[in-house]
Structures are given as C-alpha cells and as structure tokens.
Amino acid sequence: EVTTLFDDYADNGIIEEDVENQPNLIKLTMYADPSLDFNTIKSDLENRLTEANISVTSVDTNILDESTWLNSWQQYIEPTEILPNLIIKPAWQEYDNVDNKTIIEIDSDISFGTGSHETTRTCAELLKSYSESMDLNQVTCLDIGTGTGILLLVAAHLGIKHLVGIDIEEYAANQARINCENNHVSAEIICGNLDSDFNGTAQLILANLTVDPLKILLPQIGKKLEDKGILIISGIIDDRYDEIMPYIKANWHIIEERIAGPWHTFALEKR
C-alpha cells in the first residue's frame, strides 16, 4: 500500500481518497508534526515514491490549527467490528446498535488506536485466541505502548481481570486512563519505561509497536514474560520483515503469524 511509505512521518494519520473523474489518481493527506522541515519531508517522500515507481502530480502543504486538524481526520474514522459482536466506536461518531453488540467507546486526539488499523485487529484476534485457554481470573495482561488503551479494553471484554498498560508518552497514558474509566474498566496505567517502571511479570504481553522499538524491547520483554506465557507483537511492515526476524528468532519461538495487508502480527513464546 502506498500509505506504508509514509508511516515514519504520519504519526497523526493518513487519509486516502479517490479523485473524482480520475480513476488512476488517489489523493493522500498526511498529518505530520509541524516542527518537521517541510522541504526535507517533501524531498524524502518524492524519492520514496519514485523508487516505488509511483508518479506524483503535486505536493501541497498547510499548517492547521488543532481544531481543524481534529475535524479533518476524525470524520473518516468509523465504528469498526474488531471482533465478532464487539464494536470499537469513536466517541465522536454515532452507531445504530440494532443488533445489540458490545460497544467499546474510544476517545482520542490521534487517529492510531481507534480500532481501524490492521495491526490492532490482528492483535485483538490473537488475544482472543490465546486467552481462551488461560485462567482469566489469574492472568495478567500487559500492553506495551498502550496508546489509547484499546487492546486493554478488548482484553477486559474477553474477561481478563488484571490489566496493565505502559506507555512512554504522558498524553497516551492519560488517554488510556480516560478510556478505561469511560468504559468502566479497571486497569493500571504506567507512564514510563518497561525495563525500569514495570516491576512485575505477565502471562500475556501485547506490543503493537513498530520495528525499531521492538528491536530494543524484545530482550526486555523476555524478562517480563512468565514461562509458558504468550507474547503478541505487531507493527511489522513487509519492507522491514527481514530486519526484525533475527531479533525474533534469537530468543523466541513463533507459534503463529497473521498477515493483514502489508502488516505482520506474531504470537510468540520464549525458547
């Protein structure tokens, strides 16, 4: 997918739209940190697109105030069925629950962590699959890089009682706390580093991140995962698959791999 070329810039989301009466064109809107240099980004992205044999007709930039930015991408985020009969609903969207499905409501000022991304869905699927054989009253589920707390809320829906989320970003930790509270879920949310700020262990660990933090964190995660526990990792894109595999194979046994679009999600256990 074209949008995967921009992932390291577009922390705040990418919108892909068709161009009216021009079926061979698509319009991509990327929301990047305004502190970044536009000319550098433009040059870098044009080079990436050229290398991928994708032609560019024009590149424009605008500085948006916060309210305009929020409205720009929020209108595109729709309720999604992340698991059978479990709906993730953005707080700003309506949902006609005619089939009486369970609803988790997520409020967020970032587009990632609203349930629409392939990696979130595949993590949720593996979480459901591997938690079914566990004692849900005893198991601890640790979500590394918890973001909005969405996977913790899915874990709570599945019946897991002891939930811990950790994120290095204060705004993310605060957002996770708010979403847990709004959905009446009890969870410990830590703002800090895995190695120094989480002193316990867990039978089930989630890490929906990207390749760079996974390379650093995989050895640390091994110390936090109990024997016979399950680690679910995602955020591994096709282009960096070969790069991460030595880090996985060094100390982990691959139980299962799921692929959604260009993204890979793994269920692992310690060797």
Where are these regions (language model features)?
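N-terminal auxiliary segments of SAM/dcSAM-dependent transferases
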Residues: E1-V98
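Conserved SAM/SAH cofactor-binding pocket of Class I
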Residues: I110, T114-F198
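A short helix-to-beta-strand connector/capping loop
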Residues: I54-S58, P84, K161, H184-A187, ...
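SAM-dependent Rossmann-like transferase core, predominantly class I methyltransferases
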Residues: S67-D135
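Nucleotide donor/acceptor-binding cores
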Residues: I26, Q138-V139, G229
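A structural alpha-helix within SAM-dependent methyltransferase catalytic domains
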Residues: D7, A124, L153-A156, L218, ...
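S-adenosylmethionine
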Residues: E125, S129, I168-R271
